[in-house]
C-alpha cells in the first residue's frame, strides 16, 4: 500500500515523468493551474496540517481525483467535497503535457 506521494510517483514514473518523492517537493514542480482549468492528469494538492501541503492526488475529470492513503488504499473522491477535501484544497500543478 502506498501513501499519497508514493502512489503519484509510481503512476507518473510509468509515463516517464520524474517527480520529487515528497508531497511538498511535488508542489514545487510543474506549472500552476487554476482549479477551473484542471485537466486529467494534473496534480491536486491539499493542506492537511496547519503548516504545510500534506496530500496529493491526480485529477481524473468531472470534479474528481484519485489518491491513496495508508488507511484506505486508492480511492476516488470529489474535489469539492464540502466536508473535508474541498476546504483543504491549496492548488494544482501540471507536470506532464
Model-assigned labels for residue ranges:
Residues 7, 57, 92:
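Short hydrophobic/aromatic patches on the structural cores and recognition surfaces of FHA
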Residues 41-42, 63:
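Structural motif
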Residues 1-40:
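Catalytic cysteine-centered active-site loop
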Residues 20-23, 55, 94:
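Short, cationic motifs built from Arg/Lys/His that form the positively charged side of catalytic pockets
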